[in-house]
Amino acid sequence: ATADTSAVLSGLDADTAYDVYVVASADDPAYTSSLSTTVSANSSMATGGTIVRPEGEDYVVHIFKNTGGDQTSATFRLNRDIDVHHLVVAGGGGGGGDVGGGGGAGGLLASIGGTAVARSAGDHAVRVGRGGDGGAVGSAITGIGDDGFASSAFGSADDDPGVVYAVGGGGGGTWGAGDPGTEPGRDGGSGGGGGGFDSASDKSGGSATFGQGNAGGAGWQGMFAGGGGGGAGGAGTPATDNSGAAGGAGLAVAIVPATTAAGNAFGEVVGGSVYFAGGGGAGANGAAGAGGVGGGGDGTDRANETVGAAGGAATGGGGGAPGGPYGGGAGGSGVVVLRYELPA
């Protein structure tokens, strides 16, 4: 053998060390070297999160969720250089309180359907954001929904080299008692919907982050109807009468089969597809707006006397808004899914 001869060892048990020797010939082992090296089989190509190989597929996914706090931090450890697909969804914005606009969906970034990204062996940071709290009742300042929290993979800050960084959804606007200037929906991954009450005030929806979502809808320029929160697949609907507007649709992402998503409780499964980042529905004096597919929370009407519905967990959906003096629903938490092919 020459100095650069290589070989592949197969059939090794995971996490078991093996001593390797070199012999001159399998038929004539007269010469056997001293110990050449010790090798061990890696138990996996990567570790971190919940590891799933969907039935019948030749790839593995690592699923990361928010388990507490504004952001849950985790480590994705690669045991070798491989190409990795990603789905990164931030937390959704909270719905606005007191005749509010729906919360904007968390920003969504996905490589599936395109080219997987080359990633180097080593430890890589993952963070998964929670949804923003719904707006309260009592003033325009407290009535605006809170923004959702960012999610990221392969880094923590938005300027880290190679990071995939999704911006939290914008909070929904509110009716603006005593301070009409605070009514608009907030900017975010997708924008929050504008609040609805005073016809003289600004009811515009919040703007979206480029490539991550869509704008929120405006509240009605009459009275008592908020705009829908933006979703990853479509803008929030503007209110046009005394009825609340629907949240923007989320986006179907085929990073796993629907059965895998349902079995591991992330995304919203509809018709065999898995949707993420739907906008929150708006509240109104009349009929309330529905949340967008992909975890958007429904709005409520004034007669129901309830808070807006929360966005779906691990979907990044925006929170729904109420049609009366009640609180907005919290945004749904985000999710990070990382996928790589198994060697042939």
Regions found by a protein language model. Give the residues of each.
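Short linear Ser/Thr-Pro motifs
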Residues: 1, 25, 33-36, 151, ...
